[in-house]
């Protein structure tokens, strides 16, 4: 029996061996249903999270082995080998006590192994240590099939995976891991007999619940793993303490063989090293605009290697709980590391927990308190009270805060408008506001809103109310005029008042004589006819306006009736007869004198004829390379050499007869009796009806430079010769007329207006019909497009361009020869090879006409041959028309224009060519040489100390200068009068301005300010320094005396601790001597502040309004930070300036605009240059940066003194007028303007000024040669190269 039982047991044992169930170290091949998959590593977590269970995961798995005990995973225990998780939705099962559990199934490694007991709780940790149960958080935002960092081992021993917890310490982060217990797999074979042969604990069971601590060393960014609660643990053949060191973050160490003396056999575990916690930092990403209803937190990583640390394993969660414990959980799926909560309450405290999960386990947790921003206040309800004529009271109840806003409004914005809107910012402690300065009898709309100032200003909804002001006294009538239609009747007319201030319109006329009432009229229009008055009587007419409620002040005019005409008839008849006789006698005497004078001239010409050629000098032509030196040599000693040359040229060459012009029937066609054309080259017109005099006109053919009869020099047409003039234009086929005079100069008639006006359209001159098609006014000239047709010819009309130069002064010559070079460019643009001669005329047709022709011809010679013979050409001109180039100053002007052109060339650029031209000018070829733009800048004269500065450097005036290097020149400084003359509103204007003008004004006071020519000559600008505290009164006095309309302020009041401009305005009224200044309004834009001032003088009746534009985006840098804002401000302030007058005195002492910065140099100069360039671009479609800057440098020291500023002017114009398809597109001034500086570091030139102190030696030595000036200049100007501008080359765009 015993033997039989033993044999049965032995057979059963072999059967077990045959099924490979009991072989140590072997694992049966898993079935498809139980195939192992990647497992999610569970990272440290301070709070337990709910576990996931799936339909494919049973709650527990039984094993066959020693005792066949059943083991269930507890919280904190995670098996290495997991079944494939179903993608179906998870169910969350919270564990008791708030700890979440998750159950996994695994194929058994060895059926004889006994699982370790429970381990479902976290081991106790050291202070600051957080032990995290190895469970997947119950957040559906994270998929259950998260990729794992560990796989099951195919080795003989079972594979185990660690669970992780973290501890923050000063030297690094300690991470603790619990290993899961070994799992068994239930056999599919029916159990027969369980044999327990184990005498020693298995290593799989011992290491199943092992705790692994990860200690982070921030110094080398590695981890050290420590197997807790196991003594003498062996990893392979070495102690685990020596092996598990210097582990890289996010690394995977698989199949580590671990064993111990008290267990067998050895097993393997996998380690999943987490990332370092110091790689994460929490930041607030809430937009200010949404800060009242949103919270946004963003985790940022630093030096985290995502090639090792898969970003898919890192998740971010944000929990925010308000005071009412409502829990809000959001996750931004588009930006995983950013979490944002919306639709929150304003001004509410939230406690937010921001977490990072590594493979679904908390790695980092931050708890912060966040308060949302203030909410939008409630809309106040305004009430418009009973208005008066010019004010009303607006009141409103104090608004109650909305539930989501915990604070009251911080202020209110009240706006009211009739045609234009004005707004006032009010504090939050007011509930009413009196709106003043309203217009009577007008409809107004008031809007009111409340606002709070949180992170940004939040405005509530505006509520409106309306009111209508009451009537008030009307203004006086305008333009009252009186006239006498008959000897004893008076017509009285007037215009309506500026403001009627009432519902109706009545005009009242009261007539008085000798203080007694005569009569009274009432009418609805201001046209009164008063008759039946006494003859030769003085009357007083009073006209007032009545608006139905009030009557305005009366306007008074005095008028007298005439004598009775019938009583004077006999006397007048007698007087007419006597006057006629006397007039006939005078005319006969004049005729007789002219006849005698003509015969005397013929005799004189015959006497000097043989001496004409002998008095000429031998003057050599001048080569271009010595043109400047030759000019300086001849202009020296008050132009002695020029005078000698000019006086050697005969005024009239007597060998050429002048008989036709002296014929009796032609004498009335000559404007001047001594300026007549030679017979041999006069222009002959076609004869009309056998009239011999019809062929004559005072005009001569003039040869150009190697081009015969290129010009016709003519006198300015008289009223009697206008028809002949147009006949000459038609017959000579001329297409260009150059007029170098104004019709009237100095109250003298210089030329008849021989063209139709734009209003007239067409005018006939006998058979010639002239039609005007276009009229364009520019500062220095007027261009008119005319069509000329002949009534008797079938040919179509011809296009004729008429160019009138308007900047030639009444006396002398133009100050700047560049003006004539500019005129020449315009003329040559309209002339062509196939057209007839260019007709040039002034008044007499010799002085200015000869000067222009001489400049044009000599420039052609300079360009063709590189040399000029001015003397020889002027002699040639005199041989073709007497007195050509009439005075010495005109002869010198020709040389000056040639020097200007030879030194500086053509610098004007059309807007259509600006972009391509600027692109080429910035190129360097070769790269070591300056670009053409740099070379152009270097050619700019410095003009430093070119005129005297005596007044500003006087001892008593030095303290009035902010910068000793920026002192106005005497010739154009702005003088201040001590006392205003009551009889005149402005000071007398002189025809010229010289250095001595200011010096001789003993009654004038000094202020650091200079007159600067604006684009629209003769209008001026004033460039000034920022006022000092002791000169504020003088500053306002200058504004009043010079009738300034706009002040441009380009500086702050202080720069750091240094005052750069005194605050010359204040609240309320400020008094400065006889001046009273009151700030009426302030409006702030994004780039500037607009203030409105009212100026009153004790000796003047009417106040003046002055506007101040303070640029707030130019903080003292060399260039403005936002150029587009500066352009926008210029466009706005131009609306405040008066219209430019087409005519006026050249040297005009009023300025509509005053510009100042700290010392009136760099920012002021750049602004003035930009202002003039924008006007030129808008008017003429051309810009000339070089000439604009040169003109400003002559007017004030220190302007546009660096290459960067010079290039800025080109760039900003190019940005405002971008090219599109080859055409210039005028863009909105608000478009963004960007600049690319072509030079790394430009050097300032000799014209630059430092904040204070004298010029150094290098600056003194940078002086050069000056621009030519007229001989009456006391000092010569300088021409200075602007230093060596050779910065490192940059890549051209």
Curated annotation (Swiss-Prot):
The modification Phosphothreonine is found at residue 1267. Residues 53-72, 88-110, 149-169, 1283-1293 have a biased composition (Polar residues). Heavily N- and O-glycosylated. The active site is at residues 842, 1157. Residues 589-1293 are cytoplasmic. Residues 1-25 form the signal peptide. Keywords: Cell membrane, Glycoprotein, Hydrolase, Membrane, Phosphoprotein, Protein phosphatase, Repeat, Signal, Synapse, Transmembrane, Transmembrane helix. Residues 43-174, 980-1003, 1240-1293 are annotated as: Disordered. Glycans are attached at residues 66, 152, 163, 209, 213, 220, 255, 260, 292, 313, 324, 349, 418, 429, 459, 491. The modification Phosphotyrosine is found at residue 672. Belongs to the protein-tyrosine phosphatase family. Receptor class 1/6 subfamily. This is Receptor-type tyrosine-protein phosphatase C. It comes from Mus musculus (Mouse).
């Amino acid at each position: 029996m015993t033997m039989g039982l033993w044999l049965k047991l032995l057979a059963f044992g072999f059967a077990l061996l045959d099924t490979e169930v009991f072989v140590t170290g072997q694992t049966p091949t898993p079935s498809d249903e139980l195939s192992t998959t990647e497992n999610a590593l569970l990272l440290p977590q301070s709070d337990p999270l709910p576990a996931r269970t799936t339909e494919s995961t049973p709650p527990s798995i039984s094993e066959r082995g020693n005792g066949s005990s059943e083991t269930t995973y507890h919280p904190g225990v995670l098996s290495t080998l997991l079944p494939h998780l179903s993608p179906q939705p998870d169910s969350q099962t919270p564990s008791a006590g708030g700890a979440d559990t998750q159950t996994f199934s695994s194929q058994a490694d060895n059926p004889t192994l006994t699982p370790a007991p429970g381990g479902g709780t976290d081991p106790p940790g050291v202070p600051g240590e957080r032990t995290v149960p190895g469970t997947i958080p119950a957040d559906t935002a994270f998929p259950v099939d998260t990729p794992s960092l560990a796989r099951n081992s195919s080795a003989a021993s079972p594979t185990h995976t660690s669970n992780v917890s973290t501890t923050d310490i000063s030297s690094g982060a300690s991470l603790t891991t619990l290993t899961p217990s070994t799992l068994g797999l239930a056999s599919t074979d029916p159990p027969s007999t369980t044999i327990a042969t184990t005498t020693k604990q298995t290593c799989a069971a011992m290491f199943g619940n092992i705790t692994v601590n990860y200690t982070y060393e921030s110094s080398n960014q590695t981890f050290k793993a420590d197997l807790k609660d196991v003594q003498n643990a062996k990893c392979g053949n070495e102690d685990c303490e020596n092996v598990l060191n210097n582990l890289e973050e996010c690394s995977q160490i698989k199949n580590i063989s671990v064993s111990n003396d008290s267990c067998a056999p050895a097993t393997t575990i996998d380690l999943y090293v987490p990332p370092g916690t110091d790689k994460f930092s929490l930041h607030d990403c809430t937009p200010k605009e949404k800060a009242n209803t949103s919270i946004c937190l963003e985790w940022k990583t630093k030096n985290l290697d995502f090639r090792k640390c898969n970003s898919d394993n890192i998740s971010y969660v944000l929990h925010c709980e308000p005071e009412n414990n409502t829990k809000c959980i959001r996750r931004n799926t588009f930006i995983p590391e950013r979490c944002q909560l919306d639709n929150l309450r304003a001004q509410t405290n939230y406690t937010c927990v921001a977490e990072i999960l590594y493979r679904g386990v908390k790695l980092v947790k931050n708890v912060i308190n966040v308060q949302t921003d203030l909410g939008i206040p409630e809309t106040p309800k305004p009430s418009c009270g009973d208005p008066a004529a010019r004010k009303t009271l607006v009141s409103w109840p104090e608004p109650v805060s909305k539930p989501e806003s915990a604070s009251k409004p911080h202020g209110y914005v009240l706006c009211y408008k009739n045609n234009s809107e004005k707004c006032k910012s009010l504090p939050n402690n007011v509930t009413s506001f009196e709106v003043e300065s309203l217009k009577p009898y007008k409809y107004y709309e008031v809007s009111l809103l409340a606002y709070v100032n949180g992170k940004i200003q939040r405005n509530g909804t505006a509520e409106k109310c309306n009111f209508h002001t009451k009537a008030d006294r009307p203004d006086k009538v305008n333009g009252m005029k009186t006239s006498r239609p008959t000897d004893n009747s008076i017509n009285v007319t007037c215009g309506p008042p500026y403001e009627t201030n009432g519902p109706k319109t009545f005009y009242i006329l009261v007539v008085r004589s000798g203080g007694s009432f005569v009569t009274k009229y009432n009418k609805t229009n201001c046209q009164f006819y008063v008759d039946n008055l006494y003859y030769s009587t003085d009357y007083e007419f009073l006209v007032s306006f009545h608006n139905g409620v009030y009557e305005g002040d009366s306007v008074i005019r005095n008028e007298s009736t005439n004598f009775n005409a019938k009583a004077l008839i006999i006397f007048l008849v007698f007087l007419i007869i006597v006057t006629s006789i006397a007039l006939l006698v005078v005319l006969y005497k004049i005729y007789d004198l002219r006849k005698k004078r003509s015969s005397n001239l013929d005799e004189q010409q015959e006497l000097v004829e043989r001496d004409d050629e002998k008095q000429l000098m031998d003057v050599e032509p001048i080569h271009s390379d010595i043109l400047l030196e030759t000019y300086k040599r001849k202009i020296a000693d008050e132009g002695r050499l020029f005078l000698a040359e000019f006086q050697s040229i005969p005024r009239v060459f007597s060998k050429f007869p002048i008989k036709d012009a002296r014929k009796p029937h032609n004498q009335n066609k000559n404007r001047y009796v001594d300026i007549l054309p030679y017979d041999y080259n006069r222009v002959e017109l076609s004869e009309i009806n056998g009239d011999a005099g019809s062929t004559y006109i005072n005009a001569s053919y003039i040869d150009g430079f190697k081009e015969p009869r290129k010009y016709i020099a003519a006198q300015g047409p008289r009223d009697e010769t206008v028809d002949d003039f147009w006949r000459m234009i038609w017959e000579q086929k001329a297409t260009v007329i150059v007029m170098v005079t104004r019709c009237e100069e100095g109250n003298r008639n210089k030329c008849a207006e021989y063209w139709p006006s734009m209003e007239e359209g067409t005018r006939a001159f006998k058979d010639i019909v002239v039609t005007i098609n276009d009229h364009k006014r520019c500062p220095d000239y007027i261009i008119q497009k005319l069509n000329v047709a002949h009534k008797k010819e079938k040919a179509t009309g011809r296009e004729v361009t008429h160019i009138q130069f308007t900047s030639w002064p009444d006396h002398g010559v133009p100050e700047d020869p560049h003006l004539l070079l500019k005129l020449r460019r315009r003329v040559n643009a309209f002339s062509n090879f196939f057209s007839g001669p260019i007709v040039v005329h002034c008044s007499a047709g010799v002085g200015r006409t000869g000067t222009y022709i001489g400049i044009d011809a000599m420039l052609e010679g300079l360009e063709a041959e590189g040399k000029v013979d001015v003397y020889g050409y002027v002699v040639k001109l005199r041989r073709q028309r007497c007195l050509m180039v009439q005075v010495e100053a005109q002869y010198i002007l020709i040389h000056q224009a040639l020097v200007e052109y030879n030194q500086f060339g053509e610098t004007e650029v059309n807007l259509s060519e600006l972009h391509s031209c600027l692109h080429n000018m910035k190129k360097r070829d070769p790269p070591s040489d300056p670009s053409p733009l740099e070379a152009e800048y270097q050619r700019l004269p410095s003009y430093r100390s070119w005129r005297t500065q005596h007044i500003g450097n006087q001892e008593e005036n030095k303290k009035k200068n902010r910068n000793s290097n920026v002192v106005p020149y005497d010739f154009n400084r702005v003088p201040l009068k001590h006392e205003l003359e009551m009889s005149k509103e402005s000071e007398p204007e002189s025809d010229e301005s010289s250095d001595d003008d200011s010096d001789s004004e003993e009654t004038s006071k000094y202020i650091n300010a200079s007159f600067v020519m604006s684009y629209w000559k003769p209008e001026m600008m004033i460039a000034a320094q920022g006022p000092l505290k002791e000169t504020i009164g003088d500053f306002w006095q200058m504004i009043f005396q010079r009738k300034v309309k706009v002040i441009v302020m380009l500086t702050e009041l202080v720069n750091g601790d240094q005052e750069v401009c005194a605050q010359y305005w204040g609240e309320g009224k400020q008094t400065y001597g006889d001046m009273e200044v009151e700030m009426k309004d302030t409006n702030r834009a994004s780039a500037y502040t607009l203030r409105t001032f009212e100026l009153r003088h004790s000796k003047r009746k009417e106040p003046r309004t002055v506007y101040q534009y303070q640029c707030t985006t130019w903080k003292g840098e060399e260039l403005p930070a936002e150029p587009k804002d500066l352009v926008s401000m210029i466009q706005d302030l131009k609306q405040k300036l008066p219209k430019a007058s087409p005519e006026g005195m050249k040297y005009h002492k009023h300025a509509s605009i005053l510009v100042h910065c700290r010392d009136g140099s760099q920012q002021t100069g750049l602004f003035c240059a930009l202002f003039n360039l924008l006007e030129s671009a808008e008017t003429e479609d051309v810009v000339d940066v070089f000439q604009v800057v040169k003109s400003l440098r002559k007017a004030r020291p220190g302007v546009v003194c660096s290459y960067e500023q010079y290039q800025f002017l080109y760039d900003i114009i190019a940005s405002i007028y971008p090219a599109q398809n080859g055409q210039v597109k005028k863009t909105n001034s608000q478009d963004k303007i960007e600049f690319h500086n072509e030079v790394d570091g430009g050097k300032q030139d000799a014209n630059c000024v430092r904040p204070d102190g004298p010029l150094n030696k290098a600056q003194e030595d940078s002086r050069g040669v000056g621009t030519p000036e007229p001989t009456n200049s006391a000092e010569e100007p300088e021409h200075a190269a602007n230093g060596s501008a050779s910065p490192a080359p940059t890549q051209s765009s």
